[in-house]
Amino acid sequence: MSARVSLFVNCFERDYRRVLAPGFMKAKAGQFQFPFERVVVTLNNIADSTAAVALAQEARRRGELDEFIEVAAALPAALEKCGLSLRDLGLVRHYMDFALVAVAAAAPHFLLYCCAEVDLLTPFDWITDAVAKLGADPRLLVANPSWASDPGGAQRESIARNGDHWVGMGFSDQCFLADAGRLAAPIYHHKHAAGERYPMSDLGDTFEKRLDAYMLHHGLLRLSDARVFYNHAGIEGANYPKLPLFRRILRKGKKVLGFQKASPKTSETLSGGAHLADNHSMKGST
């Protein structure tokens, strides 16, 4: 029996017409070659929400998605479940809210979140193996394909090998699989200097920055499948203003000074016998 996994795709003002157009979500779900329990689209920060809802209803009637969620309406319950307030989200609210809503709505089952601009290079079911491994070892929190922008990156950043997966630190919200029950919890108040490497980090604490900090503080790891790669076609942070010059200089200085530290809590041994290094570099994590 397949695990209960829901696919969530978020859309913004810039792309909701494309995401909800005929064929898009069918193709998005099909590339994973997995029988999702639900295919869900979240509607986020859209100027004409009535128009977006109408398109989502049409997509549901076509059978391309099972559900759509308006992020603004679902956010209060998600914030409560995750121990956050609207004020906590700050300037990067829309780099946080959709993910909180997704994990809250998918819990207590598995969530595959995939950015609308992410596609696998080759259709492949990497989910079945990943679900089994995530369920078998609580030290493994998330799983993802390897990233095509740096084909050797997952191996280079790994600290162990587990079958077809590289095991390492780091997190990206571009495409990830997780037990949503573990993420729909008050785990998002951690801070870690390694978060400076993330886009938008000077504007605030995004979802991926917060979850990465939680993982580092608790010695939690991710699986990157060596058999499958994804491509992200978008421009990170396109909807947010550029930082003032002095803040960009400050950010550059922090990176030069080597603020990308690894957690001291990852010196453990996997069940397969591979030792986890405690000084693994976080630089370049996708």
Located regions from the model:
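N-proximal low-complexity "stem/linker" segments adjacent to membrane-targeting elements
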Residues: 1-29, 41
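Short, charged/polar "capping" segments at the starts of alpha-helices
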Residues: 15-18, 46-55, 151-154
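Short, acidic, metal-binding catalytic loop of nucleotide-sugar glycosyltransferases
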Residues: 22-37, 58-61
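Acidic carboxylate-rich catalytic motifs and surrounding loops in phosphoryl-/glycosyl-chemistry enzymes
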Residues: 39-44, 72-73, 145-148, 221-233
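Active-site-proximal specificity loops/subdomain of glycosyltransferases
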Residues: 44-107
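Conserved catalytic core of nucleotide-sugar-dependent glycosyltransferases
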Residues: 103, 121-200, 213
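Short beta-strand-to-loop acidic/aromatic patch adjacent to the donor-nucleotide binding site
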Residues: 108-119
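C-terminal catalytic/acceptor-binding lobe
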Residues: 175, 180-181, 187-286
